[in-house]
């Protein structure tokens, strides 16, 4: 029975990491080509955005520890799978923000650094809701003799997510090209980022609806 729960949460995290891992591909292109990185006369290299997530993690981990402890003491702490659904939803919000920021954006215009910063901040919030919880669930449900194998299954989801991330990043509308994904036409950056909005929200909603059932099986 434990395998079903592990496979279920592993399936949903694929969608999270596929959107999250755009930071190393399409989001870096966006930072380089369409983000105004000038700060008081200094142009920040696009690669520096990769340091935002680690910085946010260091700052936010204590906050999340306090938050979960507070909710636990008041009997309001969300179930583990619901935390993961919240993480997916937060990621979707981040992409929704940047999709709004680039809506009808002229290719020659660069947007404020705050749009991408906000996305990375929301990504980090989502990661802190999802990743530690997922590892904890796998570790808790796995029999001792299968713990390494099932942890490998969890890590395999990252491999699948990276493959999907690569496919999706190939849809980035560079040089005005129009692409499509499952019948959805991608003509500009807003269309592109909306892929991750729908993907994250859809996964979050389905996981939230299944949360009670999964928790009972755990």
Q: Can you annotate each of these PLM segments?
A:
Residues 6-19, 23-30, 43-212:
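Membrane-embedded alpha-helical bundles of multi-pass transporters/translocases
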Residues 1-2:
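Short, small-residue-biased leader/transition segments that mark boundaries at the very start
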Residues 33-39:
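Juxtamembrane inter-helical linkers in multi-pass membrane proteins
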Residues 214-218:
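Intrinsic disorder in cytosolic terminal tails and internal cytosolic loops
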